[in-house]
Amino acid sequence: MEMHPWLPNLKYTEEMLKEIGVNDIMNLFSDVPQDLILKRKLNIPYDKPLSEYEISQRLNELKKKNLELKYPPFIGGGLCPHYIPEAVKFIMSRSEFYTAYTPYQPEISQGLLQAIYEYQSLMAELLEMEFVNASMYDWASAIAEAVLMAHRINRRKSVLLPSNMNPYHREVVKTWVYGKGIRITELPTDSTSGQIDIEKLEQINTDDVSAIYIQQPNFYGIFEENIEYIVDFAKKKNIITIMGVSPLSLGLIKPPGEYGIDIAVGDGQEIGLPLNYGGPLMGIFAVRWDSQLVRQMPGRIVGLTKDEKGNRAFTLILQTREQFTRREKATSNITTNETLMAIGSAVYLSLLGKHGLRDLAEEIYVRSHYAKKKFEELGFKSPYSGEFFEEFVIQFPKNYNLIHSSLLNKRIHGGLQLNDYCALFCFTEVHTRVMIDELVKSIAEVL
C-alpha cells in the first residue's frame, strides 16, 4: 500500500538516510553530547492514550496545585495589575481583529488598517510625538530597536544606559547591540534621590556616544527631575535622546514630545492588556517629525490617503524602510508587531478619555503614596527620596526572603526582591486600602 508522504515510516526513513549517506538516524545528532541524549522511552504514567475528558480531569488536578492569590499581586518591576473594561476584551475577541493576518492588501483590510491607524493617532496624541508605528514586541525590544536606529543614523559606537532602568530591558539591549559592536556605558544613579547622577553624566566622554536612554519613571518608580537638562546636554553633543515612559503616568507628567525627545518607547501592558506570565505585551515606538528619524523607524506604519476614486483609504506606508526590502537593508529584523494588543490599548484609551486618564493616574498616585505612608508609620523606609508613581522601594531590617515566604503562606504576593533587604512594590487602582493595610500588617507580623 502506498504510504502518505507526510506520515513517517521506516521505508521513507531508510530512503532519506541512503540519499544523504548516513547509516543510522542517530548519526545526525553526533555533535550533541551523549549525556544530553535521552536513550530511554519517555516516562509517561499511563498505559494508554487518554481521552479528552481524562486529560481535562488531569489538568484540573494539576491546576489545584497553583497558589490562588487573595489579592492582586503587589510585585513591581514594570508589569503591574490593572483593571481592564469588558468592552476592551469583547472588541479584541472579535474575529475581524483576532487574527494573525498582516494587512499587506489594503483593499481588503480597511477595517483592520483603520483600527491600527486609530491606535497610532491616540498614542501620538498621548506622547505628543508626530509618528507612531503599529507597535513592537514589547518595551525591551523597542529600546533595542531605538538604539540600533540611532546607530544607523550617526554611526557612533556607544550608548548611555542608566543604572536605574529596568535591568531586564538592559539585558535585551545588551544582546541586540553585541553583534553591531555597540558599547554600553552605564549612567550611575544618585544614591539619595534614585535619579540619574547628573554630575557623573557630565564626566563621561561622549565623543562616540550615539544615544542616551532615560526611563520615566525609572525602574524604582521615581520621576527623573532633570530631563530638560539631560536633553539639552545631549542635543549640544548631537546625541539622540530615547525616553521610555509609563503611558498611565502621562496623565500627570509632561509627555516626551514636550521635552523635545527624539524617540519615545514604552509598553502598552498597563493600558488594557492582561498579565499572563510576562505577556502579552505591546511595545510602543514613536519619533518626532524628522525625515531621517521617520525613514529609519522600525516596524509598520499605517497612513491615510485617497484611492483613485477620491475615497478615504488606509494603507501601509514607507514600506521600503522595513523588512519588505532586502534583509541587510531593512530597518528592523526583530520584525512583526503586536497589532491585536495595540487595538486593545486603543479601545482602552478611547474608553478612558483625557479626563479619565488623569483621574486614573491621580488614583494610582494617591494609593501608592498611601501605601508608602503605611510602611513609614511602622518604621520601614525607602532608600530613595525622589518623587514616585505606582512603584517604590522599601528597605527592611530582615532578609526579604523570609518576609516574602510568609506573605505567600497568606496567599499574598509581595514585592520584587532587589537584594537581601530591599523589595520593589507596586500599587494601582485595583489595590484597595483594605488590601494595602493587610499587606503592611502581614509584613509587620514577620518582623
UniProtKB/Swiss-Prot annotation:
**Annotated family:** Belongs to the GcvP family. N-terminal subunit subfamily.
Q: Which GO terms describe its biological process?
A: glycine decarboxylation via glycine cleavage system; nucleoside metabolic process
GO molecular function term, any single one: glycine dehydrogenase (decarboxylating) activity
- Reaction(s) catalyzed by this protein? N(6)-[(R)-lipoyl]-L-lysyl-[glycine-cleavage complex H protein] + glycine + H(+) = N(6)-[(R)-S(8)-aminomethyldihydrolipoyl]-L-lysyl-[glycine-cleavage complex H protein] + CO2
Gene3D superfamilies annotated for this entry? Aspartate Aminotransferase, domain 1 (3.90.1150.10), Type I PLP-dependent aspartate aminotransferase-like (Major domain) (3.40.640.10)
Does the record carry Zinc-finger as a key word?
no
What name appears for this protein in its UniProt entry? Probable glycine dehydrogenase (decarboxylating) subunit 1
Give the classification, highest ranks. Archaea, Thermoproteota, Thermoprotei, Sulfolobales, Sulfolobaceae
Q: How does it assemble?
A: The glycine cleavage system is composed of four proteins: P, T, L and H. In this organism, the P 'protein' is a heterodimer of two subunits.
Oxidoreductase as a keyword of this entry, yes or no, is yes
Main function: The glycine cleavage system catalyzes the degradation of glycine. The P protein binds the alpha-amino group of glycine through its pyridoxal phosphate cofactor; CO(2) is released and the remaining methylamine moiety is then transferred to the lipoamide cofactor of the H protein.
The record's listing under InterPro entries reads: GcvPA, GDC-P_N, GDC_P, PyrdxlP-dep_Trfase, PyrdxlP-dep_Trfase_major, PyrdxlP-dep_Trfase_small
**Key words of the record:** Oxidoreductase
Q: What is its EC number?
A: 1.4.4.2
Class in the EC hierarchy, top level: oxidoreductase
